[in-house]
């Protein structure tokens, strides 16, 4: 069995000695206070005892103006009942997969904890998946149980489930764990109707149960399961799927636990702090930084079934007591939306009405880049945003900018305790690193750009059923197992890495490398531009051409205040010719995923279809 000391990082690396390593943060993960690699359920128990939080509210669930508070002891009781039902009634055993197709809710937390109680593998599924996407996810993991909202069941998974290994569907409703009664409950019911009476007791090829009834009728049992945290998966999560269909990342108990303890001293996480759960739990960012942070480190998770409007978010925060402070775990889209709301009513008026700005200790950005045109106004109104870098395959966090003391904006930060990173040739990993972070390598700076590779105990077990993908993305070097991230960047003399772009997003214009992120950042400085997305399109003359999709700030109109030719000229005046967009299309809004990432592929595919049909590209 591995030990944390097996992941020792050479303390000669420049990030330890360049003047930016945060004071008081151990250089090695094995030196972090109270670090212990246990099965998830054991970790939950240890945390509850260590901080004596059994009778503390650790889950705060918001439905409109209603707030439901749940004590940790209650969560354990509910989870043990759910796990007992899975084990006794359904025969679910260690290694079996339970798919959870739910929004952030008490329901999700109970289902997830119940899986960890019996050693089942929890698979998070996006509730907005269409039938074919659901079929693909369930087929890849061979899930045996599907937990889903009653409204989604009514929408019709019947065409999909008979083609899978699912033998049981557990239907639930957002009000299943709400304790309100009388008029308050009825008001909630008016907004969140129940479809349980329309859910059948069984279908032709699977049984159907109701989660609320399961909890009411099941007596919890003590179930002991032998789990090796280093080799047994705790969760299956779908990766972003930048090309083709998404893959399934297998994350072990040790992957998830080690990542939490990497972040803890760096971000100064303390039990009792509130972490805002707007990021979905089927995504590794929300799973680790919100739910697992609460259950394994003693934080309080503030849950919304969908990202709230900014007035609701601000009003909710104002109602809550937060003596330990609040962490806003979010993505650029949510930060921008909050800034836009403050500016719409005026900063002075906002701060009279709400106290969010006083309670927010810091904000953490992940799941994509953070542009200065969002960061600067947010930090002026609220607090510093610290950017984290990671992937689903790394549970997810690899690095974060230092929270206190000197730092560098626009960088990916420094690797967390226990994480090592290096820059390798993007087309020849076996040649060894271009820059490994030792002073001797001395290959620092933009001229030594390559693929960012990381190693540490947080790196996934592998891709489920994808042997070639696994071999292409997980490779051994110098006795360590490295993940090839697919991201292109370079390291500076202090160990900070600057991300240039995704390897697959790189645009080649007449032999020049164009990084979409750089063009987006430059165009974002235009006074009329609100958001911009950049991608490459095939071009007969130059190989590829740059296209930008642009939304304008409120009060500006395309073709009246500015047109594409005027904006192209501005770009040519402010960046190299080969970087300047050949096409600029104004759009009303950007397509975004539930995690707030702009879906460049969705924009690009419309034009690829036009090219294939011989039609003219807009812009």
Regions found by a protein language model. Give the residues of each.
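N-lobe entry segment of adenylate-forming
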Residues: 1-70, 74-89, 94, 163, ...
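Conserved AMP-binding A3 loop
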Residues: 69-73, 226, 234-258
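AMP-binding/adenylate-forming catalytic core of the ANL superfamily
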Residues: 129, 136, 146-148, 456, ...
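Gly/Ser/Thr-rich phosphate-binding loop
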Residues: 169, 317-318, 325-330, 340-407, ...
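AMP-binding/adenylate-forming catalytic domain of the ANL superfamily
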Residues: 172, 575-598, 616-619
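Conserved pre-ATP/AMP-binding loop-to-beta segment of ANL
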Residues: 189-238, 245, 268-274
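Conserved AMP-binding/adenylation subdomain of ANL enzymes
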Residues: 257-274, 282-327, 336-337, 341-350
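Conserved ATP/PPi-binding loop(s) of AMP-dependent carboxylate-activating enzymes
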Residues: 415-418, 428-476, 514
């Amino acid at each position: 069995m591995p030990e944390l000391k097996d992941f020792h990082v050479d303390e000669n690396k420049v990030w330890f000695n360049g003047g930016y390593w945060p004071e008081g943060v151990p250089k090695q993960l094995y030196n972090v206070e109270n670090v212990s690699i246990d099965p998830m359920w054991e970790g939950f128990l240890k945390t509850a005892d260590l901080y004596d939080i059994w009778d503390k509210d650790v889950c705060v669930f918001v439905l409109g103006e209603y707030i439901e508070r749940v004590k940790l002891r209650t969560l354990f009781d509910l989870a043990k009942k759910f796990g007992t039902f899975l084990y006794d009634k359904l025969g679910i055993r260690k290694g079996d997969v339970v798919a959870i197709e739910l929004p952030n809710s008490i329901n999700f937390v109970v289902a997830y904890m119940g899986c960890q109680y019996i050693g089942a593998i929890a698979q998070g599924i996006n509730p907005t998946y269409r039938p074919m996407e659901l079929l693909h996810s369930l087929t890849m993991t061979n899930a045996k149980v599907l937990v889903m909202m009653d409204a989604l069941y009514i929408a019709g998974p019947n065409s999909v489930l008979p083609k899978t290994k699912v033998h049981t569907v557990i239907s639930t409703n957002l009000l299943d764990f709400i304790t309100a009664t009388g008029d308050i409950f009825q008001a909630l019911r008016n907004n969140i109707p129940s479809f349980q009476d329309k859910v059948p007791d069984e279908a032709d090829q699977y049984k159907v149960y109701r989660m609320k009834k399961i909890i009411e009728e099941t007596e919890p049992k003590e179930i002991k399961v032998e789990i090796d945290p280093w080799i047994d998966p705790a969760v299956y999560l779908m990766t972003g799927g930048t090309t083709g269909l998404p893959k399934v990342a297998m994350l072990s108990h040790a992957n998830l636990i080690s990542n939490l303890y990497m972040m803890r001293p760096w971000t100064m996480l303390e039990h009792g702090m509130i972490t805002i759960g707007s990021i979905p739990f089927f995504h590794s960012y929300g799973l680790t930084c919100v739910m697992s942070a609460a259950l394994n480190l003693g934080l309080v998770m503030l849950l919304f079934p969908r990202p709230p409007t900014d007035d609701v978010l601000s009003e909710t925060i104002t109602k809550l007591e937060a003596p330990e402070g609040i962490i806003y775990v979010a993505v650029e889209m949510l930060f921008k939306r909050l800034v836009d709301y403050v500016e719409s009513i005026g900063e002075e008026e906002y701060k009279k009405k709400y106290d969010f700005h006083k309670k927010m200790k810091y904000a953490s950005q992940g799941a994509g880049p953070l542009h200065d045109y969002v960061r600067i106004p947010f930090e002026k109104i609220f607090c510093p945003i610290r950017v984290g870098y990671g992937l689903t395959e790394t549970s997810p966090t690899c690095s974060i900018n230092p929270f206190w003391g000197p730092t560098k904006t626009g960088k990916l930060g420094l690797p967390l305790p226990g994480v090592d990173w290096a820059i390798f040739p993007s087309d020849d990993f076996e040649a060894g690193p271009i820059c490994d972070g030792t002073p001797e390598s001395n290959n620092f700076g933009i001229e030594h750009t390559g693929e960012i590779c990381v190693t540490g105990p947080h790196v996934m077990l592998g891709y489920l059923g994808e042997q070639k993908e696994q071999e292409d993305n997980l490779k051994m070097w110098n006795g360590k197992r490295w993940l090839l991230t697919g991201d292109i960047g370079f390291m500076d003399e202090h160990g900070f890495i600057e991300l240039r772009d995704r390897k697959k997003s790189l645009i080649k214009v007449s032999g020049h490398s164009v990084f979409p992120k750089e063009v987006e950042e430059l165009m974002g400085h235009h006074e009329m531009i609100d958001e911009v997305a950049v991608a490459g399109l095939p071009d007969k003359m130059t190989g590829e051409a740059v296209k930008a999709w642009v939304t304008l700030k409120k009060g500006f109109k395309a073709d009246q205040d500015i047109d594409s030719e005027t904006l192209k000229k501005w770009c040519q005046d402010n960046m190299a010719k080969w970087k300047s967009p050949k096409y600029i299309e104004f759009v009303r809004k950007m397509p975004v995923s539930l995690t707030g990432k702009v879906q460049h592929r969705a924009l690009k595919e419309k034009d690829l279809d036009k090219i294939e049909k011989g039609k003219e590209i807009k812009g």
